């Protein structure tokens, strides 16, 4: 599993301090810590995340998790991107340079990763759809901005279900949609606002 976490602010975007908590939740849930590759941003000037390293890791991993800002380009979907300290990880780069031979699931804990074109919703190319094209048959995304406080709760409940068998047997990617349902139900039952739990969506198997 590859986890890419970007807690720092940049390019006019607010910091995402709870992404560090999100990573802690992943560490606690993954059955074998040696199967987790971490990329944690510290800012553009202090050891920025390498896009080349990310793309290389994505080609080999089974699970990929991104906790960062995301943006959907209004006129050129190929310029839609996950925003990292090392640069913009655009749809174009993902499509051109990433074909995940072992890919099973991509979890995009970032804003607008599944936001579509209001005028052509059936034709929109989103970041979530791009991960499907890149070789991940199951993808979790968001239709609009998500709460930084809710993200670790959703991720924790999601991976609690996916990794519930520990090292006895590998996670079943076909249960990703149900795992997301359980995770969203958890924050919904806590009394959070409607627009905080609705954005989470699943695509694929």
Task: Please annotate each region the language model reported.
Residues 1-72, 108:
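A domain-level signal for caspase-like cysteine endopeptidase catalytic cores
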Residues 12-16, 29, 44, 84, ...:
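Hydrophobic alpha-helical scaffolding
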Residues 34-39, 141, 176-177:
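Acidic/polar loop patches that form or flank catalytic/metal-binding clefts of enzymes
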Residues 62-163:
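Catalytic cores of nucleophile-dependent amide-cleaving enzymes
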Residues 151-205:
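An often Trp-containing, charged/polar helix-loop segment at the C-terminal end
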